[in-house]
Amino acid sequence: MIITAWSALSPYGTEDQAFAEGTTARRPLPHKPRPVPDFEPREYLGRQGTRTMGRATALSIAAATRLLTEDMDPTRTGLVLGTTNGSAQSILEVNRASRERKSPHHVQPSSIQNATMNSIAGQTAIWHGLQGPNATLAGGTTTGLLALGYCRRLLLTGRADVLLAGAVEELSEARTWVRSGTAPLAEGCALVRLETDATGGLAEVLAVTSLVVTDGDTKTAVRRAAERVLDRVSPGQVWATMGSGTGEDAESTALTTVCPQATRLPPVTEAVGQLHSAAGAFQLVTALTRAAVSGPGDRVVLLTSVEHQGIVAAAVVRIKGENVVA
């Protein structure tokens, strides 16, 4: 499975280059909620069809726009998108309206579509005319890596030729109520384009896996997941490891045990902020940008992610030694 392009709208800016430069230089961001700057959906996407569009949907549509080309067959192109619960703000507003208005059914119909979990993926596909598989995943911080595994199965079974995979989170009042950790809340959308028959490409996903922690031993679970995906490369071939940061010392210790000589890339939460379900997708594109400036030659990166409810995911990616700014 080949990564042929990527796109990211982040607190560093609306352009991919801004994200690449910000993460590689580790440019500091304000220690407060971090929106995507200068992103107004109606100005960015146009006024038609955006009056009632949710912010997360607009971010997803904007990111997908950069990854689609005219020669792609829309019937064979799909989208696998991660989210925590869709637009938390829209869910809150619909529930509030159903309680505060004269009757529970006196809710603005146009607001309901943004309050369903799979609305963002569906609206993105409709906007771009994609007719391939369309799926929404919700696996917490592991969602981005889980999406890679989901796409791998779709591609291997011939369900699609091209898939966009990633995750999106919007910054809203409602989301501040589910804040976790100490990093400032952040929003954004990160997507990669995945193909099987592409020549060249930016990177190859060698393996991806996930498992459930049933005994509370996160360290052992991370180690097992990492060892499982390292079946095509040896630990000594791994250039860098990158954890999610949510597993704290257990995750870091496990990565050191499995790949003691590898470079440690800091968790995406340290640079970008708390992205919740979008963390894994941003973790992947961060690894792509960091490898691109590390010098010539391919780089193998081991990614792991830990969701506090008991999910662990891991992936191994071989990144080609070339500029990977899409």
Predicted segments with their positions:
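Membrane-interface segments at transmembrane-helix boundaries
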Residues: 137-138
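Conserved "HGTGT" condensation-loop signature of ketosynthase/thiolase-family condensing enzymes
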Residues: 1-133, 145, 153-156, 168-326
